Amino acid sequence: MNNRDKRVLVGMSGGIDSSATCIMLQEQGYEVVGVTMRTWDVPSRFSTPGQDEPDDVLEARALAERLGIEHHVADVRKEFKQIIVKHFIDEYMQGRTPNPCVLCNPLFKERILCEWADQTNCAHISTGHYCRLEERKGKLYIVAGDDQTKDQSYFLWKLPQEILQRFLFPLGTYTKQEVREYLRQKGFEAKARGGESMEICFIEGDYRNFLRSQCPDIDTQVGPGWFVNSKGVKIGQHKGFPYYTIGQRKGLEIALGHPAYVLRINAEKNTVMLGDAEELKAEYMLVEDYHITEMQDLLQCKDLSVRIRYRSKPIPCQVLVLDEKQLLVRFLSEASAIAPGQSAVFYEGKRVLGGAFIASQRGIRKIAADNQDKF
């Protein structure tokens, strides 16, 4: 093992998980190099007047100094806004429900980690994700972490093999509580007591307020529209389609005498379709832009399931290839609130076989009827 093979670049957020990752890798004999990505500025609790560095940079640097490791800061704010934040806004403006972490991890953060790893002569990269890697027939697969409440395999389905080959995931066999206890044992009591990070790093609070802050003319550009029922009949006014998501029940501000849910969003007509819980259910789902490690494994899997949003339970399913861009998914148990823009991630047990983005479900009944005998 040459010097490069012993070097690992860790994405350091200054939080619990990346801190534990650095310490564990050091104990395993690796020469750890840290990099903190400055993606989006949030109000700092620690910086002094005249110093504009955010908390994650300050905390990561302090940890690096204590561990005696090399530390860098990658200022990627401009690129992050142009790629990740723009995509987030664009998706909502098309009536879709994005998950920015799915795009950010493979197409942004891990790419930057690889670039910095090359610059710092590191063979490996690592993060504090709660997941593992497993090799099968010469291919690497993401495997869900042992802590089901913190498992982050859902976000990583788009990672290509060339990046997976460089990855180390030391937290995959730990629970969050075990990681906290590990830090205490190593003398990092304050770090062990740290809080959880925000689910979307660039949004504090309601995403609707964020949309307004980034698109000041959104309310005049879009304006109020109509709530309609499943027959297309207007039943009330809404504030504008970007402010609603599939499956939403709270905050609709409409009295129908019964619980109502968002069934569909039509950005072109600025309409939001409402219905009951039964109408929200689906037997089939159309997905697009898929990335599958081995298609035959997916099609022949006898224990295939799909997660249609983060933290949702896996749903048993079957998959049919429609063309090079689209798959048709048949659910084998109840599924509801199919939200275009979200990720559909396929599992065999805890192993990720691949994923895709949930497409518009317009015409799904005809597509399903034309193909139901092909499963």
From Swiss-Prot:
Transit peptide is among the record's keywords: no
Positions annotated as active site in the UniProt record: 104 (nucleophile), 201 (cysteine persulfide intermediate)
GO terms for biological process, alphabetical: tRNA wobble position uridine thiolation
Cysteine disulfide partners in this protein: 104-201
Residues reported in the UniProt entry to bind ATP: 11-18, 37, 128
Enzyme class, first EC level, given as a word: transferase
Family annotation (InterPro entries): MnmA-like, MnmA-like_C, MnmA-like_central, MnmA-like_central_sf, Rossmann-like_a/b/a_fold
MF terms in GO: ATP binding; tRNA binding; tRNA-uridine 2-sulfurtransferase activity
Catalytic activity: S-sulfanyl-L-cysteinyl-[protein] + uridine(34) in tRNA + AH2 + ATP = 2-thiouridine(34) in tRNA + L-cysteinyl-[protein] + A + AMP + diphosphate + H(+)
EC number: 2.8.1.13
A GO CC term assigned to this protein in UniProt: cytoplasm
Subcellular location: Cytoplasm
Positions of the UniProt region annotated as Interaction with tRNA: 150-152, 309-310
PANTHER family: MITOCHONDRIAL TRNA-SPECIFIC 2-THIOURIDYLASE 1, TRNA 5-METHYLAMINOMETHYL-2-THIOURIDYLATE -METHYLTRANSFERASE
Function recorded in the entry: Catalyzes the 2-thiolation of uridine at the wobble position (U34) of tRNA, leading to the formation of s(2)U34.
Family matches, as HAMAP family: tRNA_thiouridyl_MnmA
Family: Belongs to the MnmA/TRMU family.
Protein name as it appears in the record: tRNA-specific 2-thiouridylase MnmA 3
Biological classification of the source: Bacteria, Pseudomonadati, Bacteroidota, Bacteroidia, Bacteroidales
Gene this protein is translated from: mnmA3
